[in-house]
Amino acid sequence: QPVADDPNLKERIGYISDDVFYFPAATMEDMHRFYRDVYSRFDEALYQKLKEAFPLPTGSIRRFSKGMQKQAAFHLTLSARPDVLILDEPVDGLDPVMRRQVMSLVLSDVAERGTTVLISSHNLRELEDVCDHVGILNHGKMLLEKSLADMQGGTVKLQIVGDAPAGFPVLHESRSGRLNT
């Protein structure tokens, strides 16, 4: 049965997209009620506790800044207590202090509950502090997948003028004139 047709499976998955969506004119309290009704494992005590971490204004969430909308998404999604958390550009739009705080909350959830977190990001430096395993996708194809330590120790970017020498495993190649990367 596809995930989309299985409510028991869907409620175990939390997803925060780069471009978060909220119902038109929905307030944080409206979304709080919605999440509480949809997710049977919604943790009301955690939701109240996270209000300290995410001091959000009142009013329509769509009027919040991108960073505030992202904070609202983390507040709601973490309170739903998913087993798997899928994050697309999770800290995009957040200031540096909030970036650290959000990732700290996610890592605490991993440590306390064993949550599996999948992160899609273009900012690899940001992931070094929170990931233990990485994969590189290019146009939907997995180019490389290994532990972060192995990735850092054995993968390099090489630029040469002229043709690339034979015998080197190449994950991705681009060419500009005689410059191969």
What does each of the following model-derived ranges do?
Residues 101-181:
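ABC transporter nucleotide-binding domain
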Residues 85-89:
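Catalytic Walker B motif of ABC-type/P-loop ATPase nucleotide-binding domains
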Residues 96-98:
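Helix N-cap at the start of a conserved alpha-helix in ABC-type nucleotide-binding domains
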Residues 17-73:
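ABC-family P-loop ATPase nucleotide-binding domains
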Residues 81:
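Conserved catalytic motifs of ABC-family nucleotide-binding domains
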Residues 1-8:
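ABC ATPase NBD Q-loop/coupling interface
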